[in-house]
């Protein structure tokens, strides 16, 4: 065949490909997923995902081939939020106030942050070593209350909500000057040492169980009291930009998340063994299992009591943009659940 004939054949083939919509390979999704978590039993589903390589498994099932999944441990919402918005991670985790704050800041932009699902509903307790403190009204300027991040963490917001109830809405920040930022493991160490300035810790499982097991440490308040019932403690979130660019990868992460949560609920003992091995905690598997079987603890993707926190944050001016429903704060994959 002449050169001209070959050229005509190539042009004809190209036109055929264009007409079939296959002129170029489909947009390739990311080959790496970067996720971050914090410390404690509330992040168990993510630890299960990491340990069993569930995201990698689901990605293969969805035809994405081999992908790399990186996991980071961050100590509070400040670092988590910065990492997500700077593009350093694809999936972030933390408390409900952090999700609401991120959503309010990014709503309507390509970087809009929304929840992928709740990690759990768990009691989050304020514990103290000060024998004179029977309620938050008894704290003085000699007390220091450890929270993961002052003003913005779940515990910091819960303390504000409690203060608003106790001292009046205009005094919601009355206890803020007493708070200090510490990751939960460090806060527990400081509280139990008895030699420092930390006299209270707005804690989380398993740390709060360890703390009240020591003489002189007791619980004076919980998130369930403040919010009027079971409430989501931690959430997984991502950006619309990542989800839109990587729909199959996002779906693989969700499937892995659902699988991990189902596995925990099916065999809590095995899940407790994973937590002990991965965290290096001193608790026995039996002690961890007892915490996980607390009837107030639930591993579920269903968001609960989200709007109560959002309404408070809007009322006191912490956020400028208020969601009209909990569904505004989450991607559609959980919209079919009975959230609140």
Positions of predicted regions on the chain:
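Sec/Tat signal peptide C-region and signal peptidase I cleavage site
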Residues: 22-28
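Soluble non-cytosolic domains of exported or imported proteins
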Residues: 74-78, 93, 149-157, 185, ...
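Short, glycine-/small- and polar/acidic-enriched structural segments
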Residues: 29-172, 177-181, 195, 199-205, ...
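Secondary-structure end/capping motifs
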Residues: 244-320
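Conserved C-terminal helix/tail region of periplasmic/extracytoplasmic solute-binding proteins
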Residues: 313-340
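N-terminal secretory signal peptides that target proteins for export/translocation
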Residues: 1-6
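Pocket-lining segment of extracytoplasmic ligand-binding domains
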Residues: 176, 185-276
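Bacterial N-terminal signal peptides
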Residues: 8-21
């Amino acid at each position: 065949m002449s050169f001209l004939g070959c050229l005509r054949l190539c042009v004809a083939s190209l036109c055929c490909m264009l007409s079939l919509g296959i002129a170029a390979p489909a947009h390739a999704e990311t080959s790496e997923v970067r996720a971050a978590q914090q410390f404690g039993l509330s992040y168990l589903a993510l630890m299960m995902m990491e340990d069993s390589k569930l995201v990698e498994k689901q990605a293969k099932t969805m035809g994405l081939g081999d992908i790399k999944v990186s996991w980071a441990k961050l100590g509070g919402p400040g670092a988590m939020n910065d990492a997500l918005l700077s593009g350093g991670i694809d999936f972030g985790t933390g408390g409900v106030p952090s999700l609401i704050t991120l959503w309010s800041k990014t709503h309507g932009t390509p970087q809009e942050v929304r929840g992928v699902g709740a990690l759990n509903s768990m009691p989050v307790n304020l514990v103290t070593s000060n024998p004179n403190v029977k309620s938050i009204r008894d704290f003085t300027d000699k007390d220091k209350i450890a929270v993961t991040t002052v003003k913005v963490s779940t515990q910091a917001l819960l303390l504000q909500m409690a203060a608003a109830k106790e001292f009046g809405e205009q005094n919601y920040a009355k206890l803020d000057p007493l708070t200090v930022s510490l990751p939960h493991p460090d806060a527990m160490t400081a509280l139990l040492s008895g030699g420092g300035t930390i006299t209270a810790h707005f804690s989380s499982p398993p740390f709060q169980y360890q703390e009240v097991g020591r003489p002189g440490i007791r619980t004076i308040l919980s998130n369930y009291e403040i919010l009027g019932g079971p409430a989501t403690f931690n959430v997984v979130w991502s950006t619309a930009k990542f989800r839109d660019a990587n729909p199959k990868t996002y779906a693989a992460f969700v499937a892995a998340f659902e699988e991990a949560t189902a596995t925990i609920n099916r065999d809590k003992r095995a899940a407790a063994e994973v937590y002990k091995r991965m965290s290096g905690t001193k608790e026995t598997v039996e002690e961890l299992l007892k915490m996980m079987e607390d009837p107030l603890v639930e591993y579920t993707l269903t968001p609960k009591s989200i709007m109560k926190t959002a309404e408070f944050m809007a009322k006191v001016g912490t956020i400028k943009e208020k969601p009209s429903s909990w569904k505004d704060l989450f991607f559609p994959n959980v919209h079919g659940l009975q959230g609140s």
